[in-house]
Amino acid sequence: MNSNSLLSAFRLFRVKREERPLATVMLLVFLALDALVICKYYDVFTPQTTYYWHLFISKFHISGFDPITYSVVSNWTAGYNVYRHPLLAFFMYVPYLINQGLIWLTGINCAIFIVSAIQLFAAFYSMIFLYRICREVVGVSRTDSTLATVFYFGFAFIMLSTMVPDHFVI
């Protein structure tokens, strides 16, 4: 793979001029949603402990979602069912290493911030790609693409998926 094709791959992530207003608003929405979860669980989930699994499972209370990602990023074990999600545990190894470095530097468990950053990236670019599919593949107008994207991310389950530490948006 030469450097030109590598640059074209990263060009996919460049936010186009017509996408910027929607991208700005939705980024602020995603940031606000993630901030709500961080504010709610900061005091509970940032102290260091030996048994993260029990802490996260017993204290996390958003119905229908589980905090296994927090547990895996805090203490990298086979928290995920590797038969159902064979790559997900390995995908979380690098965030686990980053968290271990941040624990060493700060003295607190930064899993909620790391997972939030991953989810923010995934939610933001899923919104961008949905807009592009509507606009460039389906061929609808800019206004209709914006409305369809906002409508899609207005569903409660989609909004929850962008803010809870489950694996749905990742």
Task: Annotate the PLM regions.
Residues 163-169:
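Short acidic/glycine- and proline-prone juxtamembrane loop motifs at membrane-interface regions
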Residues 1-18:
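Membrane-interfacial, low-structure loops and terminal tails that flank and connect transmembrane helices
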Residues 130-154:
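Transmembrane-helix signature of polytopic, membrane-embedded enzymes
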Residues 102-128:
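Loop-to-helix entry region of an early transmembrane alpha helix in multi-pass inner-membrane enzymes
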